[in-house]
């Protein structure tokens, strides 16, 4: 494994603690004190990230800072680190890739960590971005990936480490960037790995939408707009089956199309198709109101007295074809457009 560590410790246990089980995070200030000092629920993730950075960082390289940020999300989600030989993370600035192995505390039942079901997280240093790949058991059959912009997240991570500076200068944009980093890593990498590892090891899956009862999932779909239900149908096969319920789409038609005469439809009606037609018409009407068509005058009966709001001359309303058809000439142009059938069309008349 191409991981660089500093300050090796031979007495370390095979797994690093997590927030889910035995945390094992022994910083200068306990986590409960940090959270109490935060005085706000929104600071839980930034202060947990700060604890991990202060405790595990062995250098100030960009790869170490971003890798520890991903490591903090893994710990918060319940993972523990395998095969670590040190309490400090220290990655060389010239290092292009790093791999780490994680597992769950419930799976550590033997001293031989090579036989434990695990996930592999690989960090690829590519120019201004750090690409993080996650695989189940090191297999490349299904790869989960997220990409982190260094110029976007590194200043926020540096600010999180300096608690006093973060509290004084930390505006809503800094908090938003911290939670954006946390959500990107958790949604795109950590949660899929956690679900896959639990399914492979026979453990109970983490709380998620698909584990809810069918009646509750249908109730959630009823509260969504019709367009959002269409998006939910693209999530998985089960959600597509639930979103195809005919009674659900009848309810959406009556709810969103109150001005339509839905009661005229009798018998077996495909309400999903009716809602799709209604939504297309509604969208076209909205576009028509935003971009009204230009009112054109009748070329056979030109307006002698133009509208005061329209400062153009009457002849300006005609196009080239109108000049050719009626033999008209632009009064401002001595040699205006003529009929192509005119023998003097390509030269002067005089």
UniProtKB/Swiss-Prot annotation:
Residue ranges of the region described as Disordered: 1-29
Where does the record place Polar residues bias? 1-15
One of its Pfam families is: F-box-like
InterPro entries from the entry? Answer: F-box-like_dom_sf (IPR036047), F-box_dom (IPR001810)
What residues does the F-box domain cover? 206-252
Q: What is this protein called?
A: Putative F-box protein At1g23770
- Show the taxonomic lineage: Eukaryota, Viridiplantae, Streptophyta, Embryophyta, Tracheophyta
């Amino acid at each position: 494994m191409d991981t660089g560590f500093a300050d090796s410790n031979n007495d370390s246990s095979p797994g690093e603690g997590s927030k889910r089980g035995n945390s094992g995070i022994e910083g200068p200030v306990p986590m409960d004190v940090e959270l109490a000092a935060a005085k706000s629920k929104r600071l839980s993730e930034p202060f947990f990230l700060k604890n991990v950075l202060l405790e595990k960082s062995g250098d100030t390289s960009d790869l170490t800072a971003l890798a520890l940020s991903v490591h903090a999300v893994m710990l918060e989600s319940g993972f523990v680190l395998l095969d670590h030989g040190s309490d400090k993370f220290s990655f060389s600035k010239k290092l292009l890739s790093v791999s780490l192995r994680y597992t769950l505390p419930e799976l550590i039942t033997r001293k031989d960590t090579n036989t434990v079901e695990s996930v592999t997280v690989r960090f690829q240093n590519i120019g201004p971005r750090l690409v993080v790949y996650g695989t189940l058991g090191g297999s490349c059959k299904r790869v989960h990936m997220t990409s982190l912009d260094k110029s976007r997240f590194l200043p926020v991570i540096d600010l999180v480490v300096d608690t006093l500076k973060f509290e004084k200068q930390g505006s809503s944009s800094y908090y938003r960037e911290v939670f954006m980093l946390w959500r990107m890593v958790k949604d795109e990498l950590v949660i899929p790995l956690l679900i896959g590892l639990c399914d492979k090891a026979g453990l109970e899956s983490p709380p998620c939408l698909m584990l809810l009862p069918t009646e509750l999932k249908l109730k959630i779909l009823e509260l969504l707009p019709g367009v959002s239900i269409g998006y939910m149908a693209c999530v998985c096969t089960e959600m597509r089956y639930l979103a195809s319920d005919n009674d659900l789409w009848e309810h959406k038609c009556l709810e969103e199309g109150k001005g339509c005469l839905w009661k005229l439809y009798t018998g077996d009606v495909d309400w999903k198709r009716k809602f799709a037609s209604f939504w297309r018409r509604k969208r076209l009407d909205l576009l028509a109101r935003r971009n009204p068509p230009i009112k054109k005058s009748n070329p056979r009966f030109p307006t002698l007295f133009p509208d005061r709001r329209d400062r153009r001359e009457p002849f300006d309303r005609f196009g080239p074809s109108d000049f050719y058809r009626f033999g008209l000439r632009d009064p401002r142009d001595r040699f205006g457009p003529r009929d192509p059938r005119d023998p003097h069309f390509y030269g002067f008349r005089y």
